Every structure is written in structure tokens, then in C-alpha cells.
Amino acid sequence: MYNLRNRSFLNLLDFTSKDIKYLLDLSINLKKSKYAGIEVQKLKGKNIVIIFEKDSTRTRCAFEIAAYDQGANITYLGSKGNQMGSKESMIDTARVLGRMYDAIGFRGFSQQTVECLANYSNVPVYNGLTDISHPTQILADLMTIKEHKGSLKGIKIVFCGDGRGNVANSLLKGCAIMGLDFRIFAPKELFPDPDLTLKARSLALESGGKITITDSKEEAVKCADVVYTDVWVSMGESNWEDRINLLKAYQVNKEIMCMAKDDAIFMHCLPAFHDLNTVIGKDIFDKYGLDGIEVTEEIFESKNSVVFDVAENRVHTIKAIMVSTLG
């Protein structure tokens, strides 16, 4: 049986299209089994720890539910629940946790940290988000596209907003590996790193995909099957005025969706600022009069929106990673 036993999941560039296809197929099968009430627990007796330097709703819940569904035990360590980097080095922490646990999940500020955990723990380590990478999110994105469009090959997907962010970077990698026609619609100041773009174009050449980085709305959005965006400012940051002035022309709204295909789906990794029901959303409306920030309420709540399918699929894809590396 094809598996990824004992592999860490740190960066999509570590995996082939065959690896990712296997994980997506396994995710879909695990989802079907759960819905049918016939899921087989393959992780009984396994112990998993998840370390969160940055808070999250979806990522924490997805890891915990995935583990519980498969019979594993899980420990959560929040930003105030460990000594990592303060009273104990990251290397020593990795060694300790590797003796106690069968796998480690990490969500935090630095890619170097998750790689350190993988290098010194000697158990599989899963990247739940770092400053430059969000690979578990992209698995859920690709699974959702496959569910709604039937296939990934040739799908045209446009990311609108900050082309340098971890989600845009990871989409760039994943779409290049899997042969999608991926476009980033962003201001020139926020184009992705040129070296990463070069690598992605090389991968796309092998997979039959295509990579376009542009500040032209028509070039990016025309005939898109999928329109994707992310928040403009990371949680805890406050430079909204500069970001809004730079990115307001890249908001996903009715004009954008009308340029895409009629059956185009809208995706967002969440959380999203689309209404006035958050402190930040209300504050931005009062200051700038924006109807939503990165996406309007009209589009977020439209029939084209599959954002909650994506959120649910975080569970199934993370579960697939656990099963394939530990089962």
C-alpha cells in the first residue's frame, strides 16, 4: 500500500504530485467513511502533541477532531503552556517531545522552528502554519476544488491580494506541482519572491500547469474557475491604513466574480472580514467605508462561496496526513 510512513509534512515542495494525489484521495475516502459511519480507527494508542504559538480556531479543532476520530490521544500546548525558546531550547524541546509522542503538530511564527522540531524529534512533524508556509491549508483547498470541479488538471485559480503571504506562497507551490493554471492578482510591491516564482514555473512546466503573476485584473481573473483571497493583515498587526490603500483595488467583489466563469467558486482560508460583526470589520467600515475588507458580504454569502466546505475539509486532510504517516 502506498504510504508516507514516518514522513514530516513541512513544505509542499517536499512532496511529488503522486504524494499529494494520494493524500487527496485518502482525504476524500476518509470523509466518505466518516459520513457513512464506517470509519476505521488506525491510530489507536498513538499520542500526538500540537504546539500553537499563534491561536487558531480551525487548525486546532481540525487537529483534535482528526486525532479523536482515529482513536489517537492529543495534547494541546498553547503559547503560555510550554517553555520552548525561553527556559528550554527548541532542540531540547524537540528531543523531549520525540520521546513522549508519536507525532508533533506546530503552528507558529517561523518555518525554522517547525524544521528544527522535525530535525531533532525523530517523529513526524506537521506544519499547521508558519510565516512562509501553510501546507495543510492548501491540501484542504485542493480537496475542495476536486470535490466541486471533479478534477484539478487545467483548473484556473486566481488569488487576489497579497502575493507574498504564506497562503499565496503555498498555493503557488501546490498548484504548480498539481498542474493547475494559477494566477496571482496583486500590486507589484506584493508579488511573490522571484526565486519561488521561478521554482513554481519550473514545476508547472513538468506538471502541465501555468503560473501568472500580474497586477492586471483582466489577465488574472478572466475565465477563472476559482477565486481565492485571504486577510490583508495578519492577526495582531495594526497597519490597516497602508494595507487598505495598497490592496483595496484587489478586493473580491461582484465585479471580480463577474469576470470569472459563471460557475466559479469563491474560496477563503478564514477568518474573513466580510461584514460588520467583528471589532475590526466595524472599525474599518467606520474609518474607510469599505463593504467588507478583502471580500464583500455579497460574495462571501453567495451561492458561489464554498468557504465552509474548505473549513470542514481541514479535518479530513489533516486526518489523511496523520493516517498516512502514522497508521
Swiss-Prot record:
Q: Which GO terms describe its biological process?
A: arginine biosynthetic process via ornithine; arginine catabolic process to ornithine; citrulline biosynthetic process
Residue positions binding carbamoyl phosphate = 56-59, 83, 107, 134-137, 269-270, 314
Molecular-function annotations in GO = amino acid binding; ornithine carbamoyltransferase activity
Q: Name one GO cellular component term.
A: cytoplasm
| UniProt-listed Enzyme Commission number(s) | 2.1.3.3
- Which SUPFAM superfamilies is this protein grouped with? Aspartate/ornithine carbamoyltransferase
Q: Which reaction(s) does the protein catalyse, per the Swiss-Prot or TrEMBL entry?
A: carbamoyl phosphate + L-ornithine = L-citrulline + phosphate + H(+)
Residues annotated as binding L-ornithine are 166, 230, 234-235
Q: Where in the cell is it found?
A: Cytoplasm
In what pathway does it function?
A: Amino-acid degradation; L-arginine degradation via ADI pathway; carbamoyl phosphate from L-arginine: step 2/2
Q: Which domain of life is it from?
A: Bacteria
Which keywords appear in this protein's UniProt record, sorted alphabetically? Arginine metabolism, Cytoplasm, Transferase
**Role:** Reversibly catalyzes the transfer of the carbamoyl group from carbamoyl phosphate (CP) to the N(epsilon) atom of ornithine (ORN) to produce L-citrulline.
| HAMAP family referenced in this protein's UniProt entry, alphabetically | OTCase
What family, per the record?
A: Belongs to the aspartate/ornithine carbamoyltransferase superfamily. OTCase family.
Q: What is this protein called?
A: Ornithine carbamoyltransferase, catabolic
Q: Which organism is it from?
A: Borreliella burgdorferi (strain ATCC 35210 / DSM 4680 / CIP 102532 / B31)
Source lineage: Bacteria, Pseudomonadati, Spirochaetota, Spirochaetia, Spirochaetales
